[in-house]
């Protein structure tokens, strides 16, 4: 029986080529564009933003060229609740979220997938650069465009209904294929930054949502060294925007303490951590390891990969890095790999140095 596939079409080149490949693979494909804003822009500003009226038109034109039915689904309410409001709440709590990861988890592979299955579709197809082999996520052959990090939150059940046709090619090859197919989006710029912040001003967006809330900036000793307009404007590892005149050395954000509305700063070496605790674990590539098990871990999108040991303990994931990492932010994902295969993911809740933790325990 021919599988019915719903192709999520953003209006970009990747999703258009993915839909075309799904048709060539013999699936019965229908295209859908997700309207994620109740008040969309008419056009993009260069590579900033997405989900514009222009994007929906590009998606429809691509579907016409491919020769598949096309619909637009209004997901603005779900997107605002599960992605935008979550983004604001996480920053207000002193954490640094990844909205692309949350969108994949809550919108594309929860709300959209559930609706697709209810309508009789068998799978959802997207243009993500990732491979799916034997039910496991693998990094794309294009290391620069690899998106396994932001998809690692998907469960085995969700992956069983997912199709990713672009994991075996580079972005340049995707564009060349789009041109050969006569798709007008072949040269369309990739979208960057956060899609619902079209001007790229995250700090300004958060201030409009949360308001100005001045508070102290303190150093490692607790001495006040400056004032901020809102702790939500900062993330761990940040240096710019602190406006600390007369500092003897560069200072970086070490932590954000929302209860006291305090931003703590210090030297770069104080950013080092080698112990991470993650919450909300998802194990798509293996069973939860009860014993210490070697993995590779990635701690931010397109970030460095570290060797580590990890285990699940009392519903949380504990990770010990072989070498310290700098600027690890709470709220980001810690994605565990075996080589290039995703094993599991969790949301970073705690970070520390092992010797620091041992000293605190001894006290």
UniProtKB/Swiss-Prot annotation:
Binding residues annotated for ATP, in chain numbering: 8-15, 34, 127
Protein species of origin: Thermobifida fusca (strain YX)
GO BP terms in the entry: tRNA wobble position uridine thiolation
Disulfide bond entries: 103-195
Catalysed reactions, as listed in the record: S-sulfanyl-L-cysteinyl-[protein] + uridine(34) in tRNA + AH2 + ATP = 2-thiouridine(34) in tRNA + L-cysteinyl-[protein] + A + AMP + diphosphate + H(+)
Family according to the record: Belongs to the MnmA/TRMU family.
Name of this protein: tRNA-specific 2-thiouridylase MnmA
Stored NCBIfam families: PRK00143.1 (NF001138), trmU (TIGR00420)
């Amino acid at each position: 029986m021919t599988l019915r596939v719903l192709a999520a079409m953003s209006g970009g080149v990747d999703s258009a080529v993915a839909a075309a490949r799904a048709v060539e693979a013999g699936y019965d494909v229908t295209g859908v564009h997700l309207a994620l804003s109740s008040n969309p822009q008419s056009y993009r500003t260069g590579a900033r933003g997405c989900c514009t009226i222009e994007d929906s038109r590009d998606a429809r034109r691509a579907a016409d060229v491919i020769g598949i039915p096309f619909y637009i689904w209004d997901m603005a309410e779900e997107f605002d609740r599960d992605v935008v409001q979550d983004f604001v709440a996480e920053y207000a709590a002193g954490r640094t979220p990844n909205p692309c990861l949350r969108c994949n988890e809550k919108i594309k592979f929860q709300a959209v997938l559930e609706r697709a299955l209810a309508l009789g579709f068998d799978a959802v197809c997207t243009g993500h650069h990732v491979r799916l082999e034997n039910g496991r996520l693998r990094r794309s052959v294009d290391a620069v465009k690899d998106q396994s990090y932001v998809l690692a939150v998907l469960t085995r059940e969700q992956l069983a209904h997912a199709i990713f046709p672009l994991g075996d090619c580079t972005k340049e090859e995707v564009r060349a294929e789009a041109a050969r197919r006569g798709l007008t989006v072949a040269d369309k710029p990739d979208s960057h930054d956060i899609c619902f912040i079209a001007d790229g001003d995250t700090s300004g967006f958060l201030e409009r949502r949360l308001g100005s809330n001045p508070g102290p900036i303190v150093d490692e000793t607790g001495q006040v060294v400056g004032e901020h307009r809102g702790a939500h404007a900062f993330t761990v590892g940040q240096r710019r925007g602190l406006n600390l005149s007369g500092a003897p050395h560069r200072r970086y954000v070490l932590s954000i303490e929302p209860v006291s509305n305090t931003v703590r700063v210090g030297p770069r070496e104080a950013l080092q951590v080698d112990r991470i605790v993650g919450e909300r674990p998802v194990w798509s590539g293996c069973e939860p390891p009860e014993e210490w098990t070697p993995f590779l871990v990635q701690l931010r999108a397109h970030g460095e990969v570290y060797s580590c040991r990890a285990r699940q303990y009392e519903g949380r994931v504990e990770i010990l890095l072989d070498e310290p990492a700098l600027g690890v932010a709470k709220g980001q994902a810690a994605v565990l790999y075996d080589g290039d295969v995703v094993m599991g993911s969790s949301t970073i809740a705690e970070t520390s140095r092992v010797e620091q933790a041992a000293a605190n325990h001894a006290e």
